Regions:
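C-terminal catalytic domain of Rieske-type non-heme iron oxygenases
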Residues: 1-156
Length: 156
């Protein structure tokens, strides 16, 4: 996102999971939303509607939200201004980094293979485009970082 170098760092979380390629596939498709994330992602995002845009080895994956039809009146050249209000993107940078931008927080994740062949360590970093206004605002951001970690770690 434009100006990301000026964003505020919220913190990081570490997640231990399965083989990194298996875990990375979760960013590539939404078919697992209904089964793996029935309480968090599935209520707002379709499990079977995705769009892929390749940029060399990198991918932009779009997921349609259940509010997508509200974008019908938006001019096509202005749709980019409505991210997270009708659709979400995961930006995948080869070989193992993903970025998810949401109004509440932005997550930058890096999956690192190992220590064994059936394991990975995912380090997630959280950013926000504006500094927190107060302690409560900072606490809400920390809570969102914890929630995003829990979606992956506990809802699998």
């Amino acid at each position: 996102a434009k100006g990301m170098d000026q964003w505020t760092y919220v913190g990081n979380r570490v997640i231990h999971g399965p083989n990194w390629k298996v875990a990375y596939d979760g960013y590539l498709e939404g078919y697992h939303f209904k089964a793996a994330h029935p309480e968090t992602i599935e209520p707002r995002t379709y499990s079977n509607v995705m769009e892929y845009d390749a940029h060399g080895p990198h991918l932009l994956v779009g997921f349609a939200a259940k509010t997508m039809m509200t974008l019908g009146e938006v001019e096509q050249n202005e749709l980019w201004q409505h991210e997270t209000r009708g659709y979400d993107f995961i930006r995948l940078f080869f070989p193992n980094v993903s970025i998810f931008v949401a109004p509440e927080i932005t997550q930058v994740a890096q999956m690192i293979p190992g220590p064994g062949p059936l394991e990975n360590t995912t380090i997630t970093h959280f950013l926000h485009p504006k500094p927190p206004e107060n302690d409560q605002n900072q606490a809400e951001r920390i809570q969102m970082a914890d929630w995003l970690r829990d979606v992956v770690q506990e809802e699998h």
